[in-house]
């Protein structure tokens, strides 16, 4: 006996770009020299030989988003990849699949506190986002009018403005979540909220938003003020309100291979079991715009399949076999 599931998916990680067991040598997550770097591409920093990757596969995780970090207001281009291969170009499912934005403490600390420059406040962070998106709109209009121009940072934002890919907003505190939503509405952006630590406080304000809330990581002590109050209960509260929720480890903040355990903890704290399974399969696939090929077992989709010895939320369960693209992997 056992359980067969689609390969598990985490919609927000830094695997391969913030490498296991390394210091600055393997830290390629944050280009903390400029708060606006939309032309930075995660695929250019991913090391397929990160030792965390086979550990994640052995836990049944087959697909992840690899994201730039959250020191920059606009951090760069997120990639959705399969966790198998030696050449990242062959691992990519979709790149870019989203653009990384960040609100809250991280940009303020990196630039205001450490460098004495903008953004020093949440006001400045939001203003920088608006100014950059307005500039990108003007650039796009000029280009569509036939002007011969090329600016890599502005080019990166055109798919976002055309709603071809979403913005992924790093936002913990309730007011930061609402600022992200405000800006997304102003520019008619598709979007997801990453972390959503304070979302329980404003469920009535956000329950009708057409967005995926990527909740977590919820294990461990709060590392900064905006993560105080983080709870495995949040995912269940949001799904009970009818919202789409994915669960994240935010690897390497917490290990990617704990993703099934995180889902189990959410169930223990009140989340519907089926919703928790969706939160590590089809919902993160939707957040990354790759649900046509992964996230469920269906004719025509990629054969990414995991065989568990028991219920995937039982801590004694082991992974019996993992298949990626129909091939059994170790």
Task: Report residues per predicted region.
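Active-site core of metal-dependent hydrolases
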Residues: 42, 137-231, 246, 286-288, ...
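Alpha-helical segments flanking ligand/cofactor-binding loops in enzyme cores
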Residues: 54, 158, 178-181, 204, ...
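Active-site environment of divalent metal-dependent phosphoester hydrolases
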Residues: 15-18, 48, 71-74, 174-178, ...
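Metal-associated gating/positioning segment near the N- to mid-region
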Residues: 2-68
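His/Asp/Glu-enriched, well-ordered alpha-helical/loop segment
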Residues: 20-21, 27-40, 166, 207, ...
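Polyanionic/metal-chelating signatures
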Residues: 49-52, 57-191
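Short, solvent-exposed loop/turn and secondary-structure capping segments
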Residues: 18-23, 75-77, 318-319
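Active-site gating loops and adjacent loop-to-helix segments of metal-dependent hydrolytic enzymes
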Residues: 19-46, 87, 102, 107-110, ...
């Amino acid at each position: 006996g056992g359980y067969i599931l689609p390969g598990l998916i985490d919609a927000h990680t830094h695997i391969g770009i913030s490498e296991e067991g390394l210091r600055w040598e393997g830290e390629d997550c944050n280009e903390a020299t400029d708060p606006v770097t939309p032309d930075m591409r995660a695929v250019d920093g991913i090391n397929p030989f990160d030792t965390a990757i086979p550990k994640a596969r052995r836990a049944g995780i087959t697909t992840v988003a690899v994201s730039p970090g959250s020191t920059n207001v606009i951090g760069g281009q997120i990639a959705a990849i399969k966790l198998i291969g030696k050449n990242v170009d062959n691992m990519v499912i979709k790149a870019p699949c989203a653009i990384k934005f960040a609100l809250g403490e991280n940009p303020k600390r990196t630039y205001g506190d450490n460098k004495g420059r903008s953004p020093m406040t949440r006001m400045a962070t939001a203003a920088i986002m608006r100014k950059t998106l307005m500039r990108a709109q003007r650039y796009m209009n000029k280009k569509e009018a036939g002007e011969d121009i090329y600016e890599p940072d502005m080019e990166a934002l055109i798919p976002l403005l055309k709603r071809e890919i979403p913005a992924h907003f790093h936002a913990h505190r309730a007011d930061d979540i609402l600022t992200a939503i405000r800006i997304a509405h102003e520019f008619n952006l598709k979007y997801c909220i990453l972390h959503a630590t304070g979302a329980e406080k404003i469920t009535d304000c956000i329950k009708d938003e057409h967005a995926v809330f990527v909740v977590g990581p919820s294990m461990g002590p709060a590392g900064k003020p905006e993560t105080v109050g983080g709870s495995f209960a949040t995912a269940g509260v949001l799904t009970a309100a009818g919202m789409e929720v994915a669960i994240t480890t935010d690897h390497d903040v917490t290990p990617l291979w704990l993703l099934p355990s995180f889902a189990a903890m959410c169930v223990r704290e009140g989340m519907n079991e089926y919703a928790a399974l969706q939160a590590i399969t089809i919902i993160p696939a939707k957040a990354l715009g790759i649900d046509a090929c992964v996230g469920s077992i269906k004719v025509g989709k990629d054969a990414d399949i995991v065989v568990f010895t028991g219920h995937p939320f039982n801590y004694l369960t082991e992974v019996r076999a993992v298949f990626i693209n129909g091939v059994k992997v170790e």
